[in-house]
């Protein structure tokens, strides 16, 4: 849930970094990129957090954008600015940090673009599609001196941290082998059928850095 991941966001910033982000502002101003489902939940979580203000939203789906603007207004009494084009959004000085919850193929590209624009980043997992993109991401953090916090919230759960501490202390002896797995009975999105691109969607921006496909299917947006 958003509440679980939010616990890992602000603690990821050291006190000096936190003050750097704040600057002369009393609140960290946040822009959220990708606000359908997960991004909307994160935007609402930040809007409810003391010391944060969601000032800008970006999504290529106008329905998701308008829905999230309304949700944030209910929480804060203010309506964030909205934009479909990440490039135009990142030209704004209305926020210091961004939350990225786009489809996966946009993650690394959006994070690097945000750092180039001087923004700190909370990036949803996965960080990239391949090791090369991850290496580019790391180089960008060093080049632009920006903070990137990845949404691996389970690493910040107290019970997980405690277990790691006990293992390192030798509580179960020398660990020679470990096995983990994840199970989630999510329904299939199906194969979809070819339909016209809906008028509420900027399909070119949705594809972004990904290779272009000839047709749009009705299960691409879900």
Q: Where are the regions that the model predicts?
A:
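Residues that line or immediately flank small-molecule/substrate-binding pockets and catalytic motifs
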Residues: 59-61, 102, 179-182, 210
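Surface-exposed, flexible loop/turn segments at secondary-structure boundaries
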Residues: 38, 62-63, 88, 156, ...
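Redox-cofactor-proximal catalytic regions of oxidoreductases
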Residues: 49, 99, 155, 213-215
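N-terminal glycine-/serine-/threonine-rich beta1-alpha1-beta2 phosphate-ribose binding loop
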Residues: 1-123, 132-147
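Surface-exposed acidic, glycine-flexible loop patches that form ligand/cofactor-binding
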Residues: 21, 91-92, 169-171, 215
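A contiguous active-site-proximal alpha/beta segment in oxidoreductase catalytic domains
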Residues: 120-122, 127-208
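Glycine-rich, aromatic-lined ligand/substrate-binding cores of catalytic
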Residues: 35, 199-222
